[in-house]
Design a protein with these regions (language model features):
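Membrane-interface starts of transmembrane alpha-helices
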Residues: 28-32
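Conserved catalytic-loop position in the HRD/HxD motif
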Residues: 25
Length: 77
Protein backbone atom coordinates (compact mmCIF):
# COMPACT_ATOMS: atom_id res chain seq x y z
CA UNK A 1 0.00 0.00 0.00
CA UNK A 2 2.76 2.44 0.87
CA UNK A 3 4.51 1.48 -2.34
CA UNK A 4 1.39 2.47 -4.31
CA UNK A 5 1.31 5.86 -2.61
CA UNK A 6 5.01 6.41 -3.26
CA UNK A 7 4.67 5.31 -6.89
CA UNK A 8 1.74 7.71 -7.35
CA UNK A 9 3.68 10.59 -5.78
CA UNK A 10 6.76 9.83 -7.89
CA UNK A 11 4.63 9.80 -11.04
CA UNK A 12 3.10 13.17 -10.12
CA UNK A 13 6.56 14.63 -9.59
CA UNK A 14 7.77 13.15 -12.89
CA UNK A 15 4.84 14.81 -14.67
CA UNK A 16 5.55 18.12 -12.92
CA UNK A 17 9.19 17.95 -14.02
CA UNK A 18 8.13 17.14 -17.59
CA UNK A 19 5.73 20.10 -17.76
CA UNK A 20 8.28 22.47 -16.22
CA UNK A 21 6.49 23.00 -12.91
CA UNK A 22 9.37 21.49 -10.90
CA UNK A 23 13.09 22.05 -11.56
CA UNK A 24 14.42 19.44 -13.97
CA UNK A 25 17.43 18.62 -11.76
CA UNK A 26 15.19 17.02 -9.11
CA UNK A 27 14.96 13.26 -8.59
CA UNK A 28 11.26 12.29 -8.52
CA UNK A 29 11.81 9.62 -5.87
CA UNK A 30 13.65 12.04 -3.58
CA UNK A 31 10.95 14.70 -3.91
CA UNK A 32 8.23 12.10 -3.31
CA UNK A 33 9.99 10.78 -0.18
CA UNK A 34 10.41 14.32 1.14
CA UNK A 35 6.74 15.19 0.60
CA UNK A 36 5.66 11.92 2.17
CA UNK A 37 7.95 12.54 5.14
CA UNK A 38 6.56 16.02 5.77
CA UNK A 39 3.01 14.66 5.70
CA UNK A 40 3.73 11.62 7.89
CA UNK A 41 5.68 13.72 10.41
CA UNK A 42 2.72 16.08 10.68
CA UNK A 43 0.27 13.28 11.45
CA UNK A 44 2.63 11.67 13.95
CA UNK A 45 3.19 14.93 15.82
CA UNK A 46 0.07 17.04 15.21
CA UNK A 47 -0.82 17.15 18.92
CA UNK A 48 2.63 18.48 19.80
CA UNK A 49 2.54 20.89 16.86
CA UNK A 50 -0.77 22.23 18.14
CA UNK A 51 0.69 22.77 21.62
CA UNK A 52 4.06 24.18 20.53
CA UNK A 53 2.59 26.37 17.81
CA UNK A 54 -0.30 27.56 19.97
CA UNK A 55 -2.81 26.49 17.30
CA UNK A 56 -6.44 26.10 18.25
CA UNK A 57 -7.77 22.57 17.90
CA UNK A 58 -8.37 21.89 14.21
CA UNK A 59 -6.23 24.76 12.92
CA UNK A 60 -2.87 22.99 13.17
CA UNK A 61 -3.30 21.94 9.53
CA UNK A 62 -2.13 25.47 8.74
CA UNK A 63 1.32 24.27 9.81
CA UNK A 64 1.20 21.38 7.33
CA UNK A 65 0.10 23.67 4.52
CA UNK A 66 2.87 26.16 5.28
CA UNK A 67 5.51 23.42 5.56
CA UNK A 68 4.49 21.93 2.22
CA UNK A 69 4.33 25.34 0.53
CA UNK A 70 7.79 26.24 1.84
CA UNK A 71 9.29 23.04 0.46
CA UNK A 72 7.41 23.24 -2.84
CA UNK A 73 8.44 26.85 -3.39
CA UNK A 74 12.08 25.76 -3.21
CA UNK A 75 11.72 23.19 -6.01
CA UNK A 76 9.22 24.84 -8.37
CA UNK A 77 9.83 27.13 -11.30
Amino acid sequence: RLYKIHKFMSELVTEAIADGSIHNNMQPTHVAFTLESIIVFFFLTHDQIRDLGHFENGTESTYLEEALNTYLSSITN
